[in-house]
């Protein structure tokens, strides 16, 4: 509710709005709230349910549903996909993510392929939550190039 009030006030002042989300709270966003979103940075963590759950503790479907709602509402989407070696970098997973993105149609302006990093680790420690990616390394250039090309093969602009 707080974000929607801020976005509504911003729109009244003519300010561009951008929601950064995994889409997990899909059903908490009413269609009326969607009206005040100009752009959504939508994190699609994985195209595989089991991997998605391992990375987030949640389920994939709310992210898909939210992306489809955004597309139906005519909102622009920048999909963000984090490349985690040995976890999200398989060809099959990337194909699944590409198919999810295709279900959003022309709403997807581009896909950002982001290399995994450990900058969030202190947050997990501070919250005293076990960090499942504690010893995870970041990607090297080879899988990043393959993943980028896989998305491009589906017609997406990729950064």
Kindly label every feature range from the protein language model:
Residues 76, 142-159:
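C-terminal accessory region of radical SAM enzymes
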Residues 1-119, 125:
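Conserved AdoMet/S-adenosylmethionine-binding subsite of the radical SAM
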């Amino acid at each position: 509710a707080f974000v929607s009030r801020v976005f509504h006030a911003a729109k009244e002042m003519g300010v561009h709005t951008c929601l950064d989300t995994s889409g997990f709270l899909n059903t908490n966003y009413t269609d009326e709230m969607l009206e005040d979103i100009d752009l959504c940075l939508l994190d699609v963590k994985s195209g595989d349910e089991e991997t998605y759950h391992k990375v987030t503790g949640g389920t994939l479907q709310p992210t898909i549903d939210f992306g489809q709602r955004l597309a139906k509402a005519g909102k622009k989407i920048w999909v963000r996909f984090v490349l985690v070696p040995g976890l999200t970098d398989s060809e099959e997973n990337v194909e699944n993510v590409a198919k999810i993105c295709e279900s959003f149609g022309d709403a997807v302006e581009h896909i950002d392929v982001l290399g995994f990093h450990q900058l969030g680790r202190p947050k997990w420690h501070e919250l005293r939550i076990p960090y499942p990616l504690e010893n995870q390394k970041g990607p090297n250039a080879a899988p990043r190039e393959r993943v980028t090309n896989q998305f491009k093969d589906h017609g997406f602009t990729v950064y």
